[in-house]
Each structure stands twice: as structure tokens, then as C-alpha cells.
Amino acid sequence: ENVISVLDAHRHKDMVKGEQIVICGGGLSGCDCALELAMEYGKKPVIVEMMDKLAPKMIMMNRASMQRMLKEQNIEVYTGCRVEKVEDGRVSILDKDNNRSTLRADTVISAFGMRSDNLLADALEKKYGWRVRTVGDCNQIGRVGLAIREGYFAGSTIDE
């Protein structure tokens, strides 16, 4: 009941209840969400990330700026930890040495990552025999620049 997706957290701020927010996943989306909640809404987010560092695919300079902002906002970060379970307003996490910690959470935000979704493209190809070219997040979760290039090249292949 108190677990929502990172997309819902961005789109529906009223779904983010209370002050103590645990964000499960420290990629770009999770870090961005934490900063937004702290800076714009006065929440106290905590980030739990399984990898040793936050947003590993992020450009180094941008990641350094992001980490500085997280520190300035006093956002707690647990790296090298995995979420074991979520229940009764608490998130149980395990570090690499299997030490368990419990975090209080009024709301838990799932930012574990996203997968591409090209079900519509597949259905159109199957039903109508159309050649459908996917671009952006339905093709591969990535960066805006890649989506723009894919869109440009897809558009250039359309027959007149």
C-alpha cells in the first residue's frame, strides 16, 4: 500500500506520503527523485543501491555534481546494499557482509530500473504486417540523445 513506482512518484506527488521516503535503486531516476523530493517538497529521502556507486552509467562530471547535491540535501545513501523485504512501514536491507539494517519508510519508491516495452510495435507488425521501427525507451532504456538519433534515423527510412 505504501510502495509506488518512481514514475508514479514523479507524476503523482500526492502518492508520496509522509516524510521518510526510501528509494530502492540509486540509478539516475532514483537519485533524481530523491533530489526532487528533498529540494521541492522537504521530504527526507534515503537511497538504497545494490551497486558500489550511484548512477554508474552517468557521465562522471554529472555524477560528481549529483553526489554533491545529494550531500548538500543531507540525503542518506546506502550503496552495496540490497533490499531484503518491505513491510509494515519498514525496509529491511542487507549489506555485502549480510549485516541487516532496517529503515523506517512512510513511502517506498521502486526505482530498480526499467525495461524497454515494445509490445505495441510487435502487435502492429503481427496484425498488419507493418515494418515498425522502435525508438527511445520502447527500444532501449537510455539517454535522450540516443532517442533523438534513433528517431532521426527511423524517420529517414520512411518511404514517401
What are these regions (language model features)?
Residues 66-75:
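Helical element adjacent to the flavin cofactor pocket in flavoenzyme catalytic cores
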Residues 76, 84, 101-103:
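Residues that recognize and position ribonucleotide moieties
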Residues 2-58, 94-107, 111-160:
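Rossmann-like dinucleotide/flavin-binding elements
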Residues 79-90:
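A conserved short coil-to-beta-strand element within the FAD-binding core of flavoproteins
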Residues 63-66, 151-153:
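Short, hinge-like loop/turn segments at secondary-structure boundaries
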Residues 3, 74-76, 81, 132:
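Short, conserved active-site loop motifs that form the nucleotide-linked donor/cofactor pocket
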